[in-house]
Swiss-Prot record:
GO terms for cellular component: alveolar lamellar body; cytosol; extracellular space; lysosome. Residues 23-97, 106-115 form a propeptide. It comes from the Eukaryota. PANTHER family: CYSTEINE PROTEASE FAMILY C1-RELATED. This is Pro-cathepsin H. Important for the overall degradation of proteins in lysosomes. It comes from Bos taurus (Bovine). Its main location: other. Belongs to the peptidase C1 family. It is found in: Lysosome. Composed of a mini chain and a large chain. The large chain may be split into heavy and light chain. All chains are held together by disulfide bonds. It holds the Pfam family Inhibitor_I29. It catalyses: Hydrolysis of proteins, acting as an aminopeptidase (notably, cleaving Arg-|-Xaa bonds) as well as an endopeptidase. Keywords: Disulfide bond, Glycoprotein, Hydrolase, Lysosome, Protease, Signal, Thiol protease, Zymogen.
Length: 335
């Protein structure tokens, strides 16, 4: 079936159909080659009908990648596991479908006046950050941001790095205005863990990537929250202090189409908003730095280690890029 697709396009061209010009046919032939190589790499198989749909999405993404990388941007795009998807599909499967406006969150973090170190990376300070995880086709990014921050907080306080149960938050944290695979906020998840008196480990409450019934067992809780530090809305300097002096910080931001194919470099965008009502993805700031005069955050994502920079990305710091300073928080562990 695969070899038939260019012939179908060629037939349409011979019949005078406008959909397939000669130049487009040549491009599609090359894109098909790249797509089939990508399919082997990612172990993808499709029905004949889906193959054509995925090929078109892949070709569109590949053109966008090449056009973007030919221009003068601070970050590069590249093929990844999402390359056969449209951005609309990514939004449905991986981002929040339930709006999460954190503007009503009451801040309680009072920052000092600095100065702060010019750079920080908790990954290099010791065994304080768990490996990059993969949320799968579930808008549960907020649970990974939550566990990532608390895992680090416990490790910094005790020297022991736990692996915590995202699935418990998916299944059990609804009473704190979280919505499982439809979205949630780390600040609200920290409050759930605090009042629930604990969270289990991922070994005893494994991740399934779908909504389920709550199976929390208090006797198996391994991490606890004493309090939650909510950083003042849009106070990015307070985020710097928190990461420098205390802990990796959970935050949310708005993902737009140009982020989907991020490969490396310092991400910035003119297509996203800076307001708290537009954020749709939660992540974890594990450090910060500056490159060629551009300050950035070092951010742990939850799309697996093969996305971006081994599962991480850099995003421009100091401009509330895509609303990243709207929903920042971190837990104070009870140890």
């Amino acid at each position: 079936m695969w070899a038939v697709l260019p012939l179908l396009c060629a037939g349409a061209w011979l019949l005078g159909a406008p959909a397939c010009g000669a130049a487009e046919l040549a491009a599609n032939s090359l894109e098909k080659f790249h797509f089939q190589s990508w399919m082997v790499q990612h172990q993808k198989k499709y029905s004949s009908e889906e193959y054509y749909h995925r090929l078109q999405a892949f070709a569109s993404n590949l053109r966008e990648i090449n056009a973007h990388n030919a221009r003068n941007h601070t970050f590069k795009m590249g093929l990844n596991q999402f390359s056969d998807m449209s951005f609309d599909e990514l939004k449905r499967k991986y981002l929040w479908s339930e709006p999460q406006n954190c503007s009503a969150t009451k801040s309680n973090y009072l920052r000092g006046t600095g100065p702060y170190p010019p750079s920080m990376d908790w990954r290099k300070k010791g065994n304080f950050v768990t490996p990059v995880k993969n949320q799968g086709s579930c808008g549960s990014c907020w649970t990974f941001s939550t566990t990532g921050a608390l895992e680090s907080a416990v490790a910094i306080a005790t020297g022991k790095l736990p692996f915590l149960a995202e699935q418990q938050l998916v299944d059990c944290a609804q009473n704190f205005n979280n919505h499982g695979c439809q979205g949630g906020l780390p600040s609200q998840a920290f409050e759930y863990i605090r009042y629930n008196k604990g969270i289990m480990g991922e070994d005893t409450y494994p991740y399934r990537g779908q909504d389920g019934d709550c199976k929390y067992q208090p006797s198996k809780a391994i991490a606890f929250v004493k309090d939650v530090a909510n950083i003042t809305l849009n106070d990015e300097e307070a985020m710097v202090e928190a990461v420098a002096l205390h802990n990796p910080v959970s935050f949310a931001f708005e993902v737009t189409a140009d982020f989907m194919m991020y490969r490396k470099g310092i991400y910035s965008s003119t297509s996203c908003h800076k307001t708290p009502d537009k954020v749709n993805h939660a992540v974890l700031a594990v450090g910060y730095g500056e490159e060629k005069g551009i300050p950035y955050w070092i951010v742990k994502n939850s799309w697996g280690p093969n996305w971006g920079m081994k599962g991480y990305f850099l995003i421009e710091r100091g401009k509330n890029m895509c609303g990243l300073a709207a929903c920042a928080s971190f837990p104070i562990p009870l140890v």
